[in-house]
Amino acid sequence: MNDGKKFGFTTTILHSDRQKPIEHGSLHKPIHTAVAYGYRDARELADVFQGKKPGYRYGRQGNPTVTALEEKITRMEEGVSTLCFATGMAAIGALVQALLRTSDHVVSSAFLFGNTNSLWQTVDLQGMPVSFVDATDVANVERALKPTTRMVFVETIANPRTQIADLARIGALCRERGILYVVDNTMTSPYLFRPKDVGASLVLNALTKSIGGHGNALGGSLTDTGLFDWSHYPNIAESYKRFAPAQWGMAQLRAKALRDFGGALGPEAAHHLAVGSETMALRIERESSTALALATKLSADARVAAVYYPGLPTHPQHAIAKQLFRAYGGLLSFELKEGFDCFDYLNRLKIAIPASNLGDTRTLVIPVAHTIYHEMGPARRASMGIAESLIRVSVGIEDTDDLLDDFAQALNA
């Protein structure tokens, strides 16, 4: 596997661990549960702490099992390095903790996962201004920029309404202005899309979703694509400038976010996520094809008011999705027409499960306005296009016909 040949996506993931010798010939990287790491020579321990030699210091800052997962993700995203965190939200929080100051300004897409939106609102309330814009048009992002803008944050496919940011043109704008461009790749995954191709500086993945894919482990990651020039970023502390400039951002993230705030990914979760990632392409192909079939069927039903799925030709950003993504993913949402109660509908489903997660092998559904967006209130929900009857669907890997029949019978009952 080290002869320089470029392999396919799944082959690369499956054999990623073999880039280095694995203990005792194990085919999977073992789970290392140690919190501390001993050295026979105390000077070597000091060298590791001072960054003069590679090695592990304490479980909060690094672990061999987590490192193996980080290296897999780096290869998936074709980046230069990756840091893993306890959750996807911890990874987003790390951006604030390690790379931003209260005098900075952030431009964020207005179309975000509910908890991400809440986090950026909290940041704004604490004194770091955040501008929320319609990121489907780069002009809105450009108008929001200020001399103090340090970061632009977008999701590839917005959860739950599936709006798609003007990814390539925002990337070009950030590159021209020297602004950190953070792209949340969770809804597309590294299999469907590589944000590096549109100029992303950092790529965020909620590993719980498509990468892990089985709903049995939490995790998040940030990948440095190698495209951003950290030597011009004003928020790097002098202590991290002893490394090569290309390493400054991740060195500061590891220390200021992982070490100081403690959002470390545990080795057991890392192992689950790494094993889950091996079937990512197979799962996403199935989820994408079934989601397209379901979206098509729902959009033809007179009892459904609207269907949101990038694979439909009627989707406002269908052309961008078709150009950039390998397929359209397993996330869709739809609204029932007036007179149909979303709770009654969900309760009639026999296969799809009312639950709050995405990217699971099982199909999951949730009444968005009444659960994950309830805290925002009706006015903010309306501004984000969240109707009271909106149902989010995370399509799993069940047999397609079984799912189509399930959603149909719930309408017919």
Regions found by a protein language model. Give the residues of each.
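Conserved small-domain helix->loop->beta segment predominantly found in fold-type I
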Residues: 261-263, 285-286, 291-360, 376-382
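Glycine-rich beta-alpha junction loops
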Residues: 18-20, 33-39, 209, 226-228, ...
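Short, well-ordered beta-strand elements within core beta-sheets of diverse protein domains
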Residues: 272-282, 329-337, 392-396
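Conserved PLP-enzyme active-site core in the AAT-like
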Residues: 2-5, 13-22, 82-301
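N-terminal glycine-rich, Lys/His-bearing helix-loop that initiates the first secondary-structure elements
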Residues: 1-53
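PLP-dependent enzyme catalytic core of the Aspartate aminotransferase-like
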Residues: 80, 131, 147-150, 340, ...
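Conserved N-terminal alpha-helix of the aminotransferase class I/II PLP-enzyme fold
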Residues: 36, 41-93, 115-122
